[in-house]
Amino acid sequence: MKSEIHPDYHYVIFNDLASGEKILTRTTANSDKTAEWTDGNTYPVIDVEISAASHPFYTGKQRIMDTAGRVERFNARFKGFGGKK
């Protein structure tokens, strides 16, 4: 393998702003903001707006959209549009 062609892969704390959950993982992303983790070490912090800890799909709080009514309403509105001349 060639040396010095791979990006710096290091530990980072991802902070979910929606839920307050913090996740320590590895990434190539950088940040100037730092925080101390439970192991006593200081790591860069990257704020994310949403993660698996707060996304409705993963938390089970998702809404199911009723698309059948919307399709019927669309078809009723445009049923005569673009017909043969």
Swiss-Prot record:
Q: Name one GO molecular function term.
A: structural constituent of ribosome
Q: Which Pfam families match?
A: Ribosomal_L31 (PF01197)
Statement: the UniProt record of this protein carries the keyword Ribonucleoprotein = yes
Q: GO:BP terms for this protein?
A: translation
- Determine if Ribosomal protein is one of this entry's keywords: yes
Q: Name one GO cellular component term.
A: ribonucleoprotein complex
InterPro entries, alphabetically? Answer: Ribosomal_bL28/bL31-like_sf (IPR034704), Ribosomal_bL31 (IPR002150), Ribosomal_bL31_B (IPR027493), Ribosomal_bL31_sf (IPR042105)
Q: Which UniProt keywords apply?
A: Ribonucleoprotein, Ribosomal protein
Q: Which PROSITE patterns match?
A: RIBOSOMAL_L31
Superkingdom to which the source organism belongs: Bacteria
PANTHER family, alphabetized? 50S RIBOSOMAL PROTEIN L31, CHLOROPLASTIC, LARGE RIBOSOMAL SUBUNIT PROTEIN BL31C
Sorted alphabetically, which NCBIfam families does this protein's record hold?
Answer: L31, PRK01678.1
Homology family: Belongs to the bacterial ribosomal protein bL31 family. Type B subfamily.
**Assembly with partners or alone:** Part of the 50S ribosomal subunit.
Tell me the protein's name. Large ribosomal subunit protein bL31B
Q: Coding gene?
A: rpmE2
